[in-house]
């Protein structure tokens, strides 16, 4: 009798587990089918983070509007802020680490999962170009530090000093107090849309340009580049060059990028999470919001004083964004809109601009 009861319990348990597994598999197939059946976007579009994304988008649009590849468009586009001497969170004018060294991070990815990245790269103005070459000319995904510099020089890039007089002055001002605290939405000061707080760059600077594009053939691509946190510890690397954190692209679904305090994005594999949420049927906006809320749920106290924002675009060309703090914005460029800057929704409404 007891053995019969045990057998029945095992049978019922196995049946329930089997039913649950079948239901989960069915839900997964349904979500995948919804993604596969969604119509592709007819046209080209490029989106990017922050105010400086407007100029970057225009450069990318010159590629897209002439029938170019989305991958070439994003590489071209983000080179604009990399060369912009007003921009202290990306490229050659970026603020240095606490030892006075300017180090740059970047990543690039296409719809087929091909990707390349560099981190802690010094003396090269355009890290995004080196990331592209890592993708195209090596079997690797990520090169860092001295090895990344050696590779860049071997590819014909010229070594140059990236510490500008303005950045050097700001660094020496910081050394007087040597206190590091990231400031939310720090890039806004450099582009005249917010009030200056303290010295140039404030107490810290941690913002990034992330760019996503879809071309006329429906191909998706993304790029992300930054000089990272101002006054960071030497060797610190944030989310921007980490595939799945600062950037992720899947041609079956869409693409996502992030900005803000990279450590929080890395802890949650943020951009990968956004793309997977879109795969499950969420809109870009909904996916970005859920990724932000997940960061907040894990670290509720810390996130009240820092910024993280996500920007996403699915393969239908639909765009969405969400941030922890008020002040994050993104730029959109397509055949109808050439220089549109859109404020993102946020969890908290306190303005840090």
Descriptions of predicted regions:
Residues 334-336:
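Extracellular/periplasmic ligand-sensing ectodomains of membrane signal-transduction proteins
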Residues 2-19:
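N-terminal secretory signal peptides and thylakoid transit peptides that target proteins
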Residues 329-331:
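Assembly/interface hotspot detector across virion components, adhesins/toxins, and nucleic-acid enzymes
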Residues 7-12, 32, 221-228:
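Well-ordered, non-transmembrane segments within structured domains
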Residues 21-27:
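Hydrophobic h-region of N-terminal signal peptides that target proteins for export
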Residues 38-188, 194, 198-321, 325-327, ...:
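Proteins synthesized as precursors that undergo proteolytic processing into mature forms
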